[in-house]
Amino acid sequence: MIVFHLAITTAEDYVAKREPHRRAHLERLQGLRAAGIVIGGGPAPDGRRVDIFYRLQQPGQVTPAVEEDPYFLAGAWTAYTPHSFTHFVEPWERVPLVVDGSRVATIVEGPAADEDMAQFALIEARGAGRLVFGGFFEGTRTLAVMKTSRADEAIGWLADTGFWMKDGLSARPWLHVL
């Protein structure tokens, strides 16, 4: 299985375009999650982008995974960029669906100084209840979903391990829907 991060661009009128299709979209994602395909997903608080994490058997499955979604079909999602992880730290639990925006996490991205040791640090962060899931793309680039709404705290959790340079990390808020 290949784990993909899908960075999805939304329409200017995203909220209006998605609303009539929200129930069908959420039901589809929950069905894909029950089948082990969707790991997690949600939008940025401002609705300008969506990040969804899929577990697929082959790269050719990315297109139908996104383009068969009711949001894509309705024009609420306008473009997407897939990135495949070379190493991925799985979530320990399947969180319940939260659609009211109350579960805010932080996505941290940046290069790791030592990918092997950084992978252990991500596993340790998950065990400490700080990491939801995350991993590495080609070239030691990290994406980690951290269990905090504070960007400085999320960056600090990684930088304090010594396997990431604080100045090389960026963070953004993310609504962890599922």
Regions found by a protein language model. Name each.
Residues 46-49, 139-141:
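Short acidic/glycine-enriched loop/turn segments that link adjacent beta-strands
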Residues 31-32, 57-84, 149-177:
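An amphipathic, aromatic/His-enriched active-site/gating alpha helix that lines ligand/cofactor pockets
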Residues 39-46:
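Helix-loop segments that flank and shape redox-cofactor active sites
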Residues 53-56, 109, 145-148:
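Short hydrophobic/aromatic beta-strand micro-patches
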Residues 1-39, 86-141, 149-151, 159, ...:
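Short S/T/G/P-rich N-terminal loop/turn motif that feeds into the first structured element of a domain
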Residues 47-49, 77, 103:
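Short connector loops at helix/strand junctions that flank enzyme active sites
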Residues 9, 43, 55:
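Acidic/polar N-terminal loop/beta-strand segments that form early-domain functional surfaces
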